[in-house]
């Protein structure tokens, strides 16, 4: 029984973000569709070849996406919302972009589809929309075309397809309500057709992703798997693929399915591989997800070998990444600024492929000598002074309940804040960032490269902050921001100023569409050597009589949007960050900043996938936020911002944050998120986002007024704020000015009654 290896997917964007650049050039009208498609072909060919050269046996095909793989699946099935359809009923790449962005080089603009987090990762998918009586047919043949490409290049191909039950689970019903699971029988013929086409091409194995099987699904959804897979059996071998958690709780459902193999995540799941081996049908292949696809740490291959060796030779076995390598940067070898010690601790996507090749070879040969050599840096790291800071550990151990309590309750604080700020009804503000123009990016890049000295850099940043204040005063906003010209990324910026983090040059991962992020890496205990945001906040406040918000990224979000350590708990990391940022709140307050926003957009996404594990996470997540904020005085107003969230199942925890004002993303969901706050009788102030910043479309005054009136039916008007959904970093100034002018006008109209 020869053991093979494979990956579940590979990063799409390219080492230098070639896909992002090609997408944005096409959207701006600076390149043709043919040029965009050519970049995709080139990236796919390069990535297949890189994996093959690194020693991967079975190459994933179908993991590439022009915007998002869930959206690709929606198009495959002919699931195109009416507002995004071409007049002739055809589907093309611009259809896909209209669903994702609200507009494309061709076709009429329309509201983009809702976007939300992919399970508990920092990747986003476009939510499929379902309407009653919907029809499905094979419409978008990207998967088949890419399989043909890979076969023509001589590769050993394993197509990747998002499974039918998970795809339905990820979607939402629009309009008249019905059970979306009732659509399952309508989409299965399309899946049958796709599998038949793959069989015609000589494909042996298809990776069919059903990550919903790691969730605590309702029984009706679990029951749907058997008839669905009965309908799909027989044409090719199916590798039922799960990730992000273990499968043991749903194993009875899984083992009843007519598939030929199962992939399990042995990094994030608690499954015992020997127990799995005993319970799986003896003729099934087991794909062991041993290499973490979601982090950057070198694997302890000695430990991985020990985890799997007892079933070697007892069943067909593949070794694999735990999940798609989409969530990992591409190549560590191009990182020239990391020192040798730290660099030796990491493995990016290509290095993970090498790990899989090494593990496969050792499992096949039985010669384990190479494993100890590979794992040696991991042993050295355990004793490194770069990792452990006794002062941080001592401060963390000394935290008391009092450290997470504001001095007084919200009602007392609100009175003090009203007296201090004297804001009008329907106060207007933005979420923090303003457009990151070419001039701003060039300024930062020149400074980073040493082409600009510190004085000239600071003069340039100060001028952009001044312009942001002028723009906001001209627009008539009530609470201002400094615009964050000095910040490349809301997490990276803080990580750069905190001890315990390191950074990469090219460690890009896709967040959504063309948006890429370069997460910091937490390598050790976290502390704040000096104030981070105080100087620029103080300068911005000196330019205006209106309040300017201090802007911090919260501890849970910094944790969730970084690559965390694996040698301590996430709770420990979050509380270390909270203590560092607590000092920042105190310093902002001392500098005269009266409104401080602590963004926690990632609070919900950090939830464990199983509800039974939620309480413990929410307890320490809320405590971390409160440790961060509780140092503030009564008349200092603490804001928090959350996006892409569904709140109704965590409202107790949202209220427990005890922020004075919460701003949330609601425009894409047509204010439906406010139902949670209404039903809970949320006591503090709320700013429901009134327009979608992910789309370049400018909302009308009437549209914004209508949303605010809808909000006021759920939340008392005296507790409502008026703001966009999210930061404006990715937008241009023309649409930003137009949208904010309409937003301010809508608020003024409502004040007049």
Swiss-Prot record:
Bound cofactor: record note: Binds 1 zinc ion per subunit.
Residues binding L-methionine, per UniProt: 431-433, 484, 599
Reaction equations catalysed: 5-methyltetrahydropteroyltri-L-glutamate + L-homocysteine = tetrahydropteroyltri-L-glutamate + L-methionine
EC identifiers of the protein: 2.1.1.14
Residues that coordinate or bind Zn(2+): 641, 643, 665, 726
GO molecular function: 5-methyltetrahydropteroyltriglutamate-homocysteine S-methyltransferase activity; zinc ion binding
Active site (UniProt): 694
Keyword Zinc: yes
Enzyme class: transferase
Cofactor(s) demanded: Zn(2+)
Binding-site positions, L-homocysteine: 431-433, 484, 599
Listed pathway(s): Amino-acid biosynthesis; L-methionine biosynthesis via de novo pathway; L-methionine from L-homocysteine (MetE route): step 1/1
HAMAP family listed in its UniProt record: Meth_synth (MF_00172)
Assigned protein family: Belongs to the vitamin-B12 independent methionine synthase family.
Entry protein name: 5-methyltetrahydropteroyltriglutamate--homocysteine methyltransferase
Organism: Shigella dysenteriae serotype 1 (strain Sd197)
Native organism taxonomy: Bacteria, Pseudomonadati, Pseudomonadota, Gammaproteobacteria, Enterobacterales
């Amino acid at each position: 029984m020869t053991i093979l290896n494979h990956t579940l997917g590979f990063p799409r964007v390219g080492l230098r973000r070639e896909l992002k650049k090609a997408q944005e050039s096409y959207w701006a009208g600076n390149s043709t569709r043919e040029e965009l498609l050519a970049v995709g072909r080139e990236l796919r060919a390069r990535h297949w070849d890189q994996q093959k050269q690194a020693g991967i046996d079975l190459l994933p095909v179908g993991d590439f996406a022009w915007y998002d793989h869930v959206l690709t699946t929606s198009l495959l099935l002919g699931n195109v919302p009416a507002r995004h359809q071409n007049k002739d009923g055809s589907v093309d790449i611009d259809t896909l972009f209209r669903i994702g962005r609200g507009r494309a080089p061709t076709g009429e603009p329309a509201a983009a589809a809702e976007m939300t987090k992919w399970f508990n990762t920092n990747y986003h998918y476009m939510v499929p929309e379902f309407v009653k009586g919907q029809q499905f047919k094979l419409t978008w043949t990207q998967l088949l075309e890419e399989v043909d490409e890979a076969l023509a290049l001589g590769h050993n191909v394993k197509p990747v397809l998002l499974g039918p039950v998970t795809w339905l689970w990820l979607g939402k019903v629009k309009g008249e309500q019905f059970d979306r699971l009732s659509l399952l029988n309508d989409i299965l013929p399309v899946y049958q057709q796709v599998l038949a086409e793959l069989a015609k091409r000589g494909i042996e194995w298809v990776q069919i992703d059903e990550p919903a099987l790691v969730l605590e699904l309702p029984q009706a959804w679990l029951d749907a798997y058997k008839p669905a897979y009965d309908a799909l059996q027989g044409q090719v071998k199916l590798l039922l693929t799960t990730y992000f958690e273990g499968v043991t709780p749903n194993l009875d459902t899984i083992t009843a399915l007519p598939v030929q193999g199962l992939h399990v995540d042995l990094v994030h799941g608690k499954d015992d591989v020997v127990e799995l081996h005993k319970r799986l049908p003896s003729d099934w292949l087991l794909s062991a997800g041993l290499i973490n696809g979601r982090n950057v740490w070198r694997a302890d291959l000695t430990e991985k070998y020990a985890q799997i060796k007892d079933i070697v030779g007892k069943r067909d076995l593949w070794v694999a990444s735990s999940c798609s390598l989409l969530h990992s940067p591409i190549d560590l070898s191009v990182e020239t600024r990391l020192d040798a010690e730290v660099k030796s601790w990491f493995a990016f996507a290509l290095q993970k492929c090498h790990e899989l090749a090494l593990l496969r070879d050792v499992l096949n040969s039985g010669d384990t000598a190479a494993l100890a050599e590979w794992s040696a840096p991991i042993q050295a790291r355990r004793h490194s002074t770069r990792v452990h800071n006794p002062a941080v550990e001592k401060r963390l151990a000394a935290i008391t309940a009092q450290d997470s309590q504001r001095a007084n309750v919200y009602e007392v604080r609100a009175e003090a804040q009203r007296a201090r700020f004297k804001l009008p009804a329907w106060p207007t503000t933005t979420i923090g960032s303003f457009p990151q123009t070419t001039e701003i990016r060039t300024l930062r890049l020149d400074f980073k490269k040493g082409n600009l000295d510190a004085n000239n850099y600071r003069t340039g940043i100060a001028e952009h902050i001044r312009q942001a204040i002028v723009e906001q005063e001209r627009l008539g906003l009530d609470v201002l921001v400094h615009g964050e010209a000095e910040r490349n990324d809301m997490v990276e910026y803080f990580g750069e100023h905190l001890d315990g983090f390191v950074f990469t040059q090219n460690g890009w991962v896709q967040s959504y569409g063309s948006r890429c992020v370069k997460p910091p890496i937490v390598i050790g205990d976290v502390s704040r050597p000096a104030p981070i945001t105080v100087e620029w906040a103080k300068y911005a406040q000196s330019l205006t009589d209106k309040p300017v918000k201090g802007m911090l990224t919260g501890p849970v979000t910094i944790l969730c949007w970084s690559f965390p350590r694996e040698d301590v708990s996430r709770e420990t990391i979050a509380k270390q960050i909270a203590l560092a940022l607590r000092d920042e709140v105190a310093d902002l307050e001392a500098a005269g900043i009266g409104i401080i926003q602590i963004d926690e957009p990632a609070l919900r996404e950090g939830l464990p996938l199983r509800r039974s594990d939620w309480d413990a996470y929410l307890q320490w997540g809320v405590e971390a936020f409160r440790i961060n904020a509780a140092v503030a005085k009564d008349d200092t107003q603490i804001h928090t911002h959350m996006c892409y969230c569904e709140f109704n199942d965590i409202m107790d925890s949202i209220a427990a944050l005890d922020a004075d004002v919460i701003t949330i993303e609601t425009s894409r969901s047509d204010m439906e998120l406010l139902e949670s706050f209404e039903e809970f009788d949320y006591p503090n102030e709320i700013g429901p986002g009134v327009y979608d910043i992910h789309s370049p479309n400018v909302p009308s005054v009437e549209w914004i007024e209508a949303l605010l009136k809808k909000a006021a039916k759920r939340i008392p008007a005296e507790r409502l704020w008026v703001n966009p959904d999210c930061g404006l970093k990715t937008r241009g100034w023309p649409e930003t000015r137009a949208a904010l002018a309409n937003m301010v006008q809508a608020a003024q109209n409502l004040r007049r009654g």
